[in-house]
Every structure is written in structure tokens, then in C-alpha cells.
Amino acid sequence: MLLYSISKAAEKTSISSYTLRYYEKIGLLPPPKRKNSGRRFYTETDIQFMLFLKSLKETGMSLEDINEFVKDGCILEKINSDVKSAQLSPSINKRIEILTKHLEKMEIKKRELEEVISTTKGKLDTYYSILKEEVENK
């Protein structure tokens, strides 16, 4: 099994070691395994989980919502380990609620960005027209 130090995990995930320690402190990451020296080490599964957290964070999801989203662990693993879906319903419903709310926020941001992009393109067109007229008038 391949093990990663915190610096290697940070490098592999592009998440700073400071942020990894912070995520551990607030309970977003489970406490890592430690060597006899007390140094943290992470497995490939830990790395994949860090990347998942990063992807949620990159969409603008708050740490509070991410923490709520992941607190019950991996639902797919639980389904694969024969946990009854009825037992998972509360977790699934909570995740649906979080994702729905987050999707609504992202849709609003998308519309705002589309407006900014449109305005920026309009400005560029104006500036290109000015330069074109300047060249044609010489």
C-alpha cells in the first residue's frame, strides 16, 4: 500500500499542508494515521477523498455544507456493503437538499458571469472598432 506524507499529499492534491491540517482540525478530514514518529501519513483512498473535498470547495460550496455532506461517509460504500437503503434515506435526503441548494447558487453565479462575459465582449468589440477606425483613417 502506497503511503503519502502530508507534503506529498499536499503536492498530489494541490491542497496546502496548512489547509489539510485545518480540514483535519475542523473534522472535515478524519484524523490521519500516524507513524511511530507521530508524522501523518495518508493512503490513496485519503488522497481521493481530499480531491473530492477540493472539487466541492472549487464549486463554491461552503465548508459547513461540505462537512454536512460528507459527515456520514461514503454512501456508495455503504450500499456496496449491504446497508439497507432505508437506513441511508436520511443521509441521501440531506445530500439532495445540500446539492439542490448549492446548484441554485451556482446557477445564479452562472447567470451573473454570463452577464459579465457579455459586457466584457461588448467592451472588447468597442475597443477593436476604435482601433480599426484609427488604422483606416491613417
Swiss-Prot record:
Keywords: DNA-binding, Transcription, Transcription regulation
DNA-binding region: 6-25
All copies of domain HTH merR-type, residue ranges: 3-72
SUPFAM superfamilies membership: Putative DNA-binding domain
Alphabetized GO MF terms: DNA binding; DNA-binding transcription factor activity
Keyword field contains Acyltransferase: no
UniProt GO BP: regulation of DNA-templated transcription
Protein's recorded name: Uncharacterized HTH-type transcriptional regulator YyaN
Organism: Bacillus subtilis (strain 168)
Organism taxonomic ancestry: Bacteria, Bacillati, Bacillota, Bacilli, Bacillales
Gene: yyaN
